[in-house]
Amino acid sequence: MTILKWGLSLAVGGFLIIFGVTKFTGGAHIFPLIEMNATDLGVPFAGLFFPVVNYVTGLLELVAGALVLLPMTRKSIGAPLAVLPFLGAVVFHLSPLLGVVTPNGYAEGADGLDAALQAGSGFEPSHFTAETGPVLFILAAAFLLLSVINAYLHKQG
């Protein structure tokens, strides 16, 4: 059982840290996509999705990832906290703000993308690749399941 707990903790923690880092390096294209969809739907404060919610989510992922990897914090806070980013991802993928099928990234050489990223607004469909798929949703759902199992196993002792 110890090997299973360690394996789950390493998988969940590593995934959270890797994806948390992308929120600060510009590699996460999902938040600009959410902002664009939220603006189109008339959601108040849509401009906060990128970069504010992007950075808050990245920070949560980094903290949860670190806490789930550290043995002294894993059981008390790390494993339960690690569920939240994945739950949020699944909820957003099931909402009209994101959807299950999403673009696979930024379009290469997208006109105005750098200016839009620097301004934090003004995203357009041409900024994202035409290739779409459910990969991010499947990853979010799979890691939600793994993080819930991890939290349950650590709660049981």
Place the predicted regions along the sequence by residue:
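Membrane-interface extramembranous regions
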Residues: 1-157
